[in-house]
Amino acid sequence: MRNTVFSFRFYFFIQLMKIDRHRLTDITQTPTPNFDERPEPTDISLLVIHCISLPPGEFGNCYIDRLFCNQLDPDTHPYFKDIYQLTVSAHLLIKRDGSCVQYVPFDKRAWHAGESAYEGRERCNDFSIGIELEGTEWVEYTDQQYAQLAAVIRILLEAYPKLSTQRITGHSNIAPGRKTDPGASFDWQKLLELLNYQEQ
């Protein structure tokens, strides 16, 4: 029964969404100033999976939006005093309930990867799409998040031909020693099985 519900969620998400002018339709759009132009706008060839929660381990609040939009109040929580001046972003955030927020159009360069390299190529922000999952490295991600993530990836694969299922990686893989997300709690096999199921 669980697999049936899981598959239904996947098809529900993928049927709703399309890409129009490099933005997903039928999701929340929250524009951020934290982006710039890609050196080669058509070179979108890598998907990077991250995780984030603010404060760490707390879910379902407005603080991720505020961080990405440079509106985080350092007096709200002690943790914010060290991060509120960061200018960072991702293209997408997938929340615990599977709902999705887009901050940056896919043809623009979001500031999610930092110092990074993939297969010998540096500056992954130049050629990647960054997807944040609301979560931590020690708490399991939800079925709704996997369903939404798989649906989003399938749509991105169709829209941007340089992407492939072989070019999906974690932040930890492009910034080893510096970053550890999405962590051991992320089930790569579950994601790949869902993507492969859609191909059948």
Tell me what each language-model feature is.
Residues 1-16:
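N-terminal amphipathic/basic-hydrophobic helices that include classical n-h-c signal peptides
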Residues 12-122:
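N-terminal catalytic cores of peptidoglycan-degrading enzymes
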Residues 17-25, 122, 127, 136-200:
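Basic/polar, cationic surfaces and motifs that engage anionic cell-wall
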Residues 131:
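Conserved, mostly hydrophobic/aromatic
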